[in-house]
């Protein structure tokens, strides 16, 4: 990347990509809501996948603009600090999202379900509303919402996927070291291995979801357990999907020689996100 004038903070021109991203989110969320509630609604799946397609176009289009500005030498140290702070806040927002839903899971598991079962100061709830209900976990509540279901064994695909992600953390670290040492071919190999591990994780998670829905009757309708399970694992899957897309972009950039040993925050930011 060329160097911008010291002290001159680059202000980008107006961009339509945020509007495109908003349209993608609207289509995806509306399509997903209809798909979940209406099943095979006429517009549910087409709208959902249209939103996904628009989002991918937005992602690559916006990447292209930012990469072009970087290669044109419009960014200086001030802009670099802004990018770093922006990425940190973005990752922090994801951490808070997960914290909120893990908090909901903890509340349901440790507090609300025992109360409904008559434990603690919630004994009257069981006595007057849900008499006869015995607290257990996992559960879909005293109303048996969604029917009886089974859980996914922890030592099956979940263990495999955990090992895949831990391995990908090692490979992306090796790739970063290869970049800093100027070993471009080794960088591409390790980065490619990380992408392959991420794609394999996504394949197995999709397989896991199909098994949950078709064989275990574990769905979004399976009470508090089903809803929190799919929210947490689904959002994590989205995180891995976005990370895999960004890693793929980084692979092509590295193949074109875009980064140097000392100037590679684009790569570093994706590595932060992946970890």
What are these language model-derived features?
Residues 1-274:
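...captures the hydrophobic TM-helix bundle architecture rather than a specific catalytic motif
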């Amino acid at each position: 990347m060329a160097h911008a004038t010291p002290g001159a903070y680059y202000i980008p021109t107006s961009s339509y990509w945020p509007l495109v991203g908003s349209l993608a989110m609207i289509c995806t969320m509306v399509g997903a809501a209809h798909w979940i509630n209406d099943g095979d609604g006429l517009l549910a799946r087409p709208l959902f996948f249209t939103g996904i397609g628009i989002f991918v176009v937005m992602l690559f289009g916006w990447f292209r603009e930012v990469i072009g500005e970087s290669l044109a030498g419009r960014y200086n140290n001030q802009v670099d600090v802004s990018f770093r702070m922006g990425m940190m806040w973005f990752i922090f927002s994801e951490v808070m999202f997960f914290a909120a839903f893990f908090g909901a899971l903890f509340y349901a598991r440790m507090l609300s379900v025992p109360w409904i079962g008559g434990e603690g100061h919630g004994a009257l709830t069981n006595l007057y509303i849900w008499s006869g209900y015995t607290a257990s976990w996992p559960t879909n509540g005293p109303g048996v919402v969604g029917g009886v279901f089974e859980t996914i064994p922890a030592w099956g695909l979940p263990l495999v996927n955990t090992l895949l992600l831990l391995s990908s953390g090692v490979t992306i670290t090796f790739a970063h070291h290869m970049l800093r040492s100027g070993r471009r071919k080794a960088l591409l190999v390790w980065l490619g291995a990380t992408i392959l591990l991420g794609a394999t994780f996504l394949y197995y998670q999709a397989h896991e979801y199909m098994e949950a829905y078709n064989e275990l009757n574990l769905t979004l309708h399976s009470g508090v357990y089903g809803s929190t399970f799919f929210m947490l694992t689904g959002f994590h899957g989205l995180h891995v999907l976005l990370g895999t897309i960004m890693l793929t972009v980084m692979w092509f950039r590295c193949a074109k020689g875009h980064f140097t040993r000392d100037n590679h925050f684009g790569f570093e930011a994706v590595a932060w996100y992946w970890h």
